[in-house]
Amino acid sequence: MPFLRVDAYEGRSKEQVKNLLDAIHRAVLSAFGVPPRDRYQVYQAHADSNFIVQDTGLNIKRTRNVVFIAITSRQRTEQQKTNLYSRLVEELKACGIEQNDIVVSLVTNSDADWSFGNARAQFLTGEL
């Protein structure tokens, strides 16, 4: 049940944002094997003055198409994680986003760290 936050420069149309989020969802489905209805995504567009993208010494050139994808998820294997990075590149290429403009942060947690409402930890109670 991954939770995704996507941050990017402002300027994308509603259709472009929908296509972007759909592409990311397909990558997560493929790499993590989660059910299609497990979709929790937040998209935030930022003005130039509120978005700083610097080189970290890897000599990766960024453009205004850069997207930051922060994923909070239950523990995944290294293979699942590297598959996700590859699938994101494949899926986002159709949205005009090149691999140099995809930044991913994956944070894992445990079953006790999730509540989907009603003050319950559904992974612990067996509801999920």
Residue ranges: model-predicted function:
Residues 1-128:
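Interaction-mediating elements
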